[in-house]
């Protein structure tokens, strides 16, 4: 609806140029998990809708984000990696203590956690435009994760313990009573405003689709399934990044398990309400 057609090929150069033409400056992986169980979090317990050990490990890593060419302010305690594609930076603080403002259509504005995820680096690299060996365009990319409410309480408690994990861990699944996972990508910079596109999967939909899942685990499993099927169909492809896999083939496989796939424009900016 901006008068530009997406590339037919998987050539990353074409996708990078499209992102540049759309004036995309920032990309958030914007996720809000509202699932709630009857039994609330207890003291010295970490509660989550997916792997507790995985979330703790990711949250304690230094916050990493793809670093855009439009950025003018160097963050305090930031550094560059001494290896790799040089599309990202890191902050000398845990992602679980790094808050970022973001937006999803149903939640609206929120403060999430800048949790390290590999796609923040690979997407910023994938969408890099170079001219004569010099980087002329690259968006800032990072996660903006607002986990379920009991997981937020768990993070606060762990921070107070000087980042020592609780002795008890509980993954809520069969005891989830309500809520959904709203997981998508927020594009920022286009003159039309922000645009979010992603999956809205309720706990009721997840249980109807595949037993022994909650909304979060099924969204993850759908992507894993699609990747495995693609690998079986392409045995000679070698090692590939997720961004280089045919997205149409992946969505065809994963689509039945993702609930409502939808996109929405908004007029939100990170400066709203901060005057």
Annotate each predicted stretch with a short phrase:
Residues 3-275:
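C-terminal catalytic/substrate-binding lobe primarily of soluble NAD(P)-dependent oxidoreductases
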């Amino acid at each position: 609806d901006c008068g530009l057609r997406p590339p037919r090929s998987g050539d990353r150069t074409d996708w990078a140029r499209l992102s540049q033409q759309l004036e995309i400056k920032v990309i958030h992986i914007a996720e809000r998990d509202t699932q709630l169980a009857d039994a609330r979090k207890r003291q010295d317990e970490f509660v989550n809708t997916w792997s507790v050990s995985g979330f703790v490990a990711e949250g304690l890593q230094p916050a990493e984000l793809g670093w855009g060419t439009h950025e003018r302010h160097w963050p305090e305690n930031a550094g560059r990696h001494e290896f790799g594609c040089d599309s990202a930076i890191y902050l000398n603080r845990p992602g679980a203590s790094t808050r970022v403002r973001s937006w999803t259509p149903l939640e609206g504005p929120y403060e999430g956690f800048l949790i390290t995820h590999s796609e923040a680096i690979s997407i910023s690299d994938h969408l890099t435009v170079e001219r004569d060996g010099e980087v002329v365009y690259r968006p800032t990319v990072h996660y903006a994760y607002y986990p379920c409410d009991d997981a937020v309480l768990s993070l606060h408690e762990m921070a107070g313990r000087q980042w020592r994990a609780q002795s008890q861990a509980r993954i809520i699944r069969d005891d989830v009573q309500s809520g959904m996972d709203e997981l998508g990508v927020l594009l920022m910079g286009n003159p039309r405003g922000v645009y979010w596109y992603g999956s809205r999967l309720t706990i009721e939909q997840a249980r109807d689709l595949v037993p022994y899942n909650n909304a979060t685990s099924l969204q993850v499993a759908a992507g894993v399934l699609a990747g495995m099927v693609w690998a079986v169909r392409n045995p000679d492809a070698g090692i590939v990044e997720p961004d280089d896999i045919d997205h149409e083939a992946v969505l065809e496989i994963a689509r039945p398990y993702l609930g409502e796939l939808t996109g929405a424009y908004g007029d939100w900016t990170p400066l709203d309400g901060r005057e």
